Regions:
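Conserved ATP-binding/catalytic motifs of P-loop helicase motor domains
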Residues: 1-213
Length: 213
């Protein structure tokens, strides 16, 4: 995979963390953040991971979601709203549909995480725990790989004040909404496996082309 997708050292490290985690049984739940500016190759890591699971004949274990339809379409994934049944009335039929969506799924690649508010993250984790009947585990015990660039695209509603890194969240959690925001922020703090891509692959390609002229 490293050679096929021409991964650099940073990209290879991110790929190996997920690939190795998927191979060895009885691993702790993976909660990972893959960060980096545009052009550093986050999508290339995703492509390598998708191909890895497909070659293992285990594509069902790996799903891709994003906050918007356009972002999801670019990655060949779904919106998290449709995949997880967020914003839908949780009837038995709807919960059964979400459970079917997640049948066999063990890894979720979540792109454009900067667009999530802290409350969004709480609602996602709460829904997954409910659907997968795993109330003790955040995100229903699924392995989560969040990706994005916090220098871009803050939450569409509320901006930086409701973001996962907002300092104002948790100071006073008196209402249900503020409590959910505080839990969401705490969930983000559980994401302790971090790989930041720093090498701009677009600039590298352009420099190579310039040298050939």
């Amino acid at each position: 995979m490293v050679l096929k997708f021409k991964l650099n050292k940073e990209q290879e490290r991110a790929f190996q963390i997920v690939a190795n985690h998927s191979i060895f049984p009885h691993q702790d739940q993976l909660k990972m953040y893959l960060g980096g500016m545009g052009g550093t190759g986050k999508s290339r890591v995703l492509a390598a991971l998708s191909d890895f699971f497909a070659l293992q004949k285990e594509a069902h274990r790996f799903v891709i979601v994003a906050p918007t339809g356009s972002a999801a379409a670019l990655l060949g994934g779904s919106t998290y709203h449709s995949m997880f049944g967020i914003n839908d009335f949780n009837s038995n039929a709807q919960l059964s549909k979400v459970k079917a969506n997640l049948a066999g799924v063990e890894y979720v690649f979540f792109d454009e995480v900067s667009m999530l508010s802290a409350r969004d993250l709480y609602r996602i984790s709460n829904q997954l725990s409910k659907v997968l009947n795993s109330p003790e585990d955040s995100f229903g015990g699924l392995n989560m790989v969040f990706s994005g660039d916090f220098a871009q695209l803050p939450p569409a509603v509320g901006g930086e004040g409701v973001s996962l890194y907002s300092r104002s969240i948790g100071a006073i959690a008196s209402s249900m909404k503020s409590q959910e925001e505080a839990i969401g922020k705490a969930l983000w703090h559980q994401v302790t496996t971090v790989v930041i891509l720093r090498q701009n692959m677009r600039q590298k390609i352009q420099s190579t082309l310039d040298n050939q002229l």
